[in-house]
Curated annotation (Swiss-Prot):
Pfam entry (one): ig
This protein's name: Immunoglobulin heavy constant epsilon
Entry-linked Gene3D superfamilies: Immunoglobulins
Assembly, per entry: The basic structural unit consists of two identical heavy chains and two identical light chains; disulfide-linked. N-terminal variable regions of the heavy and light chains form the antigen binding sites, whereas the C-terminal constant regions of the heavy chains interact with immune receptors to mediate effector functions.
Alphabetic keyword roster: Cell membrane, Disulfide bond, Glycoprotein, Immunoglobulin domain, Membrane, Secreted
UniProt main location, coarse: secreted
Length: 421
């Protein structure tokens, strides 16, 4: 009967200028097996040995490599009728020069209007002209913000390099882990950092919320919201605002809310000029109290990075839905930044927010750095069967003016139609 092989990658314990690797293929029947080596190295030679054994077979394949950089070698084995597996071996030269990494960041308590944190990755003692740097956030490569990488020193055949990356305060305060990934001589080196321990009053949390695209581009009344939660009371709490163009600005609205868990929250709303926000001017919300060791400062500006317009898809109700309601779903994906507004219309008229709900933006998987959301609308079965038209309206800054995109669905249309508004 057919028996598939077992694979064992073989590697010497000690590195030399040239290195011989092996791939042991054993306990298979019948002959033959095919062994193929793959590598990014041009300096390699291979030898395949004949199979041994009267019943279960065993064979070996060898590859010899030489060079100054680390490389991956993959042994790929096939055995009829369907066996198809690989094993990969990393080869590091004996005389590899390992650089030293140092990852630094700017203040953990940034009070500047442009709420960015600077990450600096210093790479000391690498081979000249043999270094590449990439940045990761929670193990995912950052592609929407460009890093600045410069050579800072040459010492014979060695050099030192610095890479600088700007991230938003929101990214930093999310407690994500940021990684500087350096590749030199084919080997990866990593340095990690994350935000400093909390320096603010325990329990009191402050959020600074940007203008919604709906208010910014359609209603013409953009506003910033500063939300302070988990206060004992509003007594002696002082909330002030600063704007980059002015020393201070006055909020137009202030709300206090008492909660069942005996805490108090404060909401301060600041109207902003749309042109100032779009041009990137910064704002600060400062929360102070006599018992605080220091004021809580939150800064915000328009999110930096390459813009990406959303893709919009509307799905009809599922056929299995049997009650008097019908559920329409709108998928909005691959947009950046994450600020987005979604509304639903019925025959061109705005539908109440109580009839639909929208998820918070979620990060897309894979290499795409965009976001996606779902919006769900419930309508009466009679309205759907009467061939009413329902529209998912999306407002986002990366769309063409007037920054709106609509997708309409109806039983009378037969399918959906997409149009900019």
């Amino acid at each position: 009967s057919i028996r598939n092989p077992q694979l064992y990658p073989l590697k010497p314990c000690k590195g030399t200028a040239s290195m011989t690797l092996g791939c042991l293929v054993k306990d298979y029947f019948p002959n033959p097996v095919t062994v193929t080596w793959y590598s990014d190295s041009l300096n390699m030679s291979t030898v395949n040995f004949p199979a041994l054994g009267s019943e279960l077979k065993v064979t070996t394949s060898q590859v010899t490599s030489w060079g100054k950089s680390a490389k991956n070698f993959t042994c790929h084995v096939t055995h009829p009728p369907s066996f198809n597996e690989s094993r990969t071996i990393l080869v590091r030269p004996v005389n590899i020069t390992e650089p030293t990494l140092e990852l630094l960041h700017s203040s953990c308590d940034p009070n500047a209007f442009h709420s960015t944190i600077q990450l600096y990755c210093f790479i000391y003692g690498h081979i000249l002209n043999d270094v590449s740097v990439s940045w990761l956030m929670d193990d995912r490569e950052i592609t929407d913000t460009l890093a600045q990488t410069v050579l800072i020193k040459e010492e014979g055949k060695l050099a030192s390099t610095c890479s600088k990356l700007n991230i938003t305060e929101q990214q930093w305060m999310s407690e994500s882990t940021f990684t500087c990934k350096v590749t030199s001589q084919g080997v990866d080196y990593l340095a990690h950092t994350r935000r400093c321990p909390d320096h603010e009053p325990r329990g009191v949390i402050t959020y600074l919320i940007p203008p919604s695209p709906l208010d910014l581009y359609q209603n013409g009344a953009p506003k910033l919201t500063c939300l302070v939660v988990d206060l004992e009371s509003e007594k002696n709490v002082n909330v002030t605002w600063n704007q980059e163009k002015k020393t201070s600005v006055s909020a137009s609205q202030w709300y206090t809310k008492h909660h069942n868990n005996a805490t108090t929250s404060i909401t301060s709303i600041l109207p902003v000029v749309a042109k100032d926000w779009i041009e990137g001017y910064g704002y600060q919300c400062i929360v102070d109290h006599p018992d605080f060791p220091k004021p809580i400062v939150r800064s915000i500006t328009k999110t930096p990075g390459q813009r990406s317009a959303p893709e919009v898809y509307v799905f009809p109700p599922p056929e299995e839905e049997s009650e008097d309601k019908r559920t329409l779903t709108c998928l909005i994906q691959n947009f950046f930044p994450e600020d987005i507004s979604v509304q639903w219309l019925g025959d061109g008229k705005l539908i109440s927010n109580s009839q639909h709900s929208t998820t918070t933006p979620l990060k897309s998987n894979g290499s795409n750095q965009g976001f996606f959301i779902f919006s769900r609308l419930e309508v009466a079965k009679t309205l759907w069967t009467q061939r009413k038209q329902f529209t998912c309206q999306v407002i986002h800054e990366a769309l063409q003016k007037p920054r709106k995109l609509e997708k309409t669905i109806s039983t009378s249309l037969g399918n959906t139609s997409l149009r900019p508004s």
